[in-house]
């Protein structure tokens, strides 16, 4: 199977002490490269003649596949357990008291484990062992040394690429910032699922879909998903562009945001979302329109929805421009447009 890029699950501009620049670089460059590498490894394996291939070649590719799979999964878990305010839930506090003696004892061990990787590399995981029915803090080296029959519920990336942009060699400050941004609701949900005690969220199921006009930077991906807006993934968009002479791809980043950046998707045109009444008349109603913003949270969704109301076959890009770059999509200098 081909591994696909997930949209960045956090609002990278809203973290406490972890910069948007660092988080986006981590997502686009490190996570994105790993996804593409995994797909390349699998292509090599698919083309390999196993009847004649040397054992060392098979062994090397399978090891590389294992490490790449681990890196992809751990990166996705890492990003997804950020975005909170660091306030621990009562359920997780009770779990730490049961398994470590107290929240403070767990915190001391977890942070000491993280500090032990200063100047090195690896992951720090809080994992639930189904075999032991117990929580453990552990180190995972080379993206693959995880406990057997265990589920990571909290993931901290201690590779230098995760923090050097903001913190240089000061890994301790990075660890402190990470702890301030943990989404303990996410961690608790993972633990409940690992233990088999997760209950279906009736509140989430019953939550009414909000109006598109209410979309703002405060929305998370689950709230946007409940709107059921027409969308497209980076892989699907790449296929659409490849089969058309000229695809209608719009960069809908707001003017104040667009002016701060020097690049954009190759082949796209920028249009100010505040002036949709003017430029929407230039679009061809017989061709689909693909709209992206920076991260796929609200601007691109709103513009695509407004175009649909005007009779266009419009879709927003899930994950926005950042997911396109993570997938290795072509870019160009915005001043050329």
Regions found by a protein language model. Give the residues of each.
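Feature for soluble, non-membrane regions of globular proteins
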Residues: 1-210
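Active-site flanking residues adjacent to catalytic metal/cofactor-binding acidic residues
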Residues: 159, 250-252
């Amino acid at each position: 199977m081909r591994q696909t890029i997930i949209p960045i699950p956090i609002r990278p501009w809203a973290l406490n002490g972890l910069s948007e620049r660092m988080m986006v670089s981590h997502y686009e460059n490190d996570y994105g490269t790993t996804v593409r590498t995994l797909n390349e490894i699998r292509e090599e394996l698919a083309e390999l003649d196993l009847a004649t291939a040397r054992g060392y070649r098979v062994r090397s590719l399978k090891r590389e596949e294992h490490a790449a799979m681990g890196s992809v999964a751990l990166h996705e878990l890492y990003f997804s357990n950020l975005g909170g305010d660091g306030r621990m839930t009562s359920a997780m506090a009770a779990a730490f008291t049961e398994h470590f003696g107290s929240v403070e004892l767990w915190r001391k061990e977890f942070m000491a484990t993280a500090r032990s990787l200063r100047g090195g590399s690896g992951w720090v995981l809080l994992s639930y062992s189904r075999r032991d029915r117990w929580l453990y803090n552990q180190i995972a080296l080379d993206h693959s040394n995880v406990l057997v029959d265990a589920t990571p519920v909290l993931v901290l990336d201690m590779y230098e690429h995760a923090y050097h942009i903001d913190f240089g060699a000061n890994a301790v400050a990075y660890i402190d910032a990470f702890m301030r941004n943990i989404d303990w609701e996410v961690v608790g949900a993972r633990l409940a699922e690992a233990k088999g005690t997760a209950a279906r969220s009736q509140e989430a199921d019953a939550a009414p879909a909000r109006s598109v006009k209410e979309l703002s930077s405060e929305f998370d991906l689950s709230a946007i998903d409940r709107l059921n807006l027409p969308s497209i993934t980076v892989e699907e968009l790449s296929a659409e562009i490849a089969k058309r002479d000229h695809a209608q791809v719009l960069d809908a980043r707001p003017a104040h945001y667009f002016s701060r950046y020097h690049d954009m998707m190759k082949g796209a045109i920028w249009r100010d979302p505040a002036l949709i009444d003017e430029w929407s008349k230039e679009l061809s109603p017989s061709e689909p329109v693909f709209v992206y913003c920076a991260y796929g949270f609200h601007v691109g969704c709103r513009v695509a929805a407004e175009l649909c109301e005007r009779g266009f076959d419009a879709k927003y890009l899930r994950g926005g421009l950042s997911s396109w770059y993570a997938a290795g999509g072509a870019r160009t200098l915005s001043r050329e447009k």
